Amino acid sequence: MARTKQTARKSTGGKAPRKQLATKAARKTPATGGVKKPHRYRPGTVALREIRKYQKSTELLIRKLPFQRLVREIAQDFKTDLRFQSQAVVALQEAAEAYLVGLFEDTNLCAITAKRVTIMPKDIQLARRIRGERA
């Protein structure tokens, strides 16, 4: 059927508004006794806000004590009773976080290249292989 162009027509009044029926009025009030639903942002809004927040910030994202325990645990395999200066642990943490951020940036690019927005283990493997870290 062919499309026809619609022209504006002048309104000639229309019907008067009717009174609400009792059933409609009862339906509009919440039946749960006025319990308000908690506000939820649309999917992705909070994620984008977090991305902007963490891109602006420079503080360390991994907690200091768990990272320190991990460093000491790994160092135990090489030599027992090793001591660390506090600045040494902070330097290791800075380097580790910088490495991880770079790896996740490359991983995200791999996912985007595959026309996806979700990163997968195969993206991390590809990013490391391209970097020459893993054959």
Swiss-Prot record:
Coiled coil: none annotated. It is found in: Nucleus; Chromosome. The modification Phosphothreonine is found at T12. Residues 1-40 are annotated as: Disordered. The modification N6-acetyllysine is found at K10, K15, K19, K24, K28. GO terms for cellular component: nucleosome; nucleus. The modification Phosphoserine is found at S11. Acetylation is generally linked to gene activation. Acetylated to form H3K9ac (11%), H3K14ac (17%), H3K18ac (11%), H3K23ac (16%) and H3K27ac (7%). H3K4, H3K35 and H3K36 are not acetylated. H3K4me prevents acetylation. 32% of the histone H3 are acetylated with, on average, 2.4 acetyl-Lys. They are all continuously deacatylated and re-acetylated with a half-life of approximately 2 minutes. GO terms for molecular function: DNA binding; protein heterodimerization activity; structural constituent of chromatin. Keywords: Acetylation, Chromosome, DNA-binding, Methylation, Nucleosome core, Nucleus, Phosphoprotein. The modification N6-methyllysine is found at K5, K10, K28, K36, K37. The record marks K5, K36, K37 as: Not N6-acetylated. The record marks K15, K19, K24 as: Not N6-methylated. PANTHER family: HISTONE H3. Belongs to the histone H3 family. The nucleosome is a histone octamer containing two molecules each of H2A, H2B, H3 and H4 assembled in one H3-H4 heterotetramer and two H2A-H2B heterodimers. The octamer wraps approximately 147 bp of DNA. Core component of nucleosome. Nucleosomes wrap and compact DNA into chromatin, limiting DNA accessibility to the cellular machineries which require DNA as a template. Histones thereby play a central role in transcription regulation, DNA repair, DNA replication and chromosomal stability. DNA accessibility is regulated via a complex set of post-translational modifications of histones, also called histone code, and nucleosome remodeling. This is Histone H3 type 3. It comes from Chlamydomonas reinhardtii. The lineage of its organism: Eukaryota, Viridiplantae, Chlorophyta, core chlorophytes, Chlorophyceae.
